[in-house]
């Protein structure tokens, strides 16, 4: 059976998948599976209750994401540990969601996934990632906006094999926010350097050139 996390028969039906949901998950993701979750780890993730999904009141799954523990030796958690994010192996990282093109509840889904992850890992840190796709910047900006609107904070932009860069988000914000230091676009070459200096983005705006991240420091 599927564990029900939250249910609204009209719009939202978030559930933690078990192995019984493997076929439904495969129908949503196709042969590629969930991003950054190696195919040979999917069965284990289902058995361990590490995949959250939403039917959104439909017969088929509409969205899904995996929560990978940082001690895992898969490429994603390994690269995060190497970059200093959860270097002790405690905590977890939420993979980018796969969703039906008509799915409209992404922000709600992300909030639910973060709440579930935070409860599951208690005091440990929760991260989320998003590949930077310069060649499809509007879609990348839209997903980043959904992440930030769901309560995530952009903390880093790191190189990662197979991507143009990996945006790294934290479920925790800075304790005290100062006034905005700078506004940057996702494709600005200065973004990674500013984030490395300890600045972070939890909010954004829209300008003539697209999404503008408001970079702030902790006071």
Language-model-derived ranges and their functions:
Residues 55-58, 115-123:
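Secondary-structure boundary elements
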Residues 91-95, 99-119, 141-142:
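Conserved acetyl-CoA-binding loop-helix of GNAT-fold acetyltransferases
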Residues 90-94, 118-138:
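Conserved GNAT acetyl-CoA-binding A-motif
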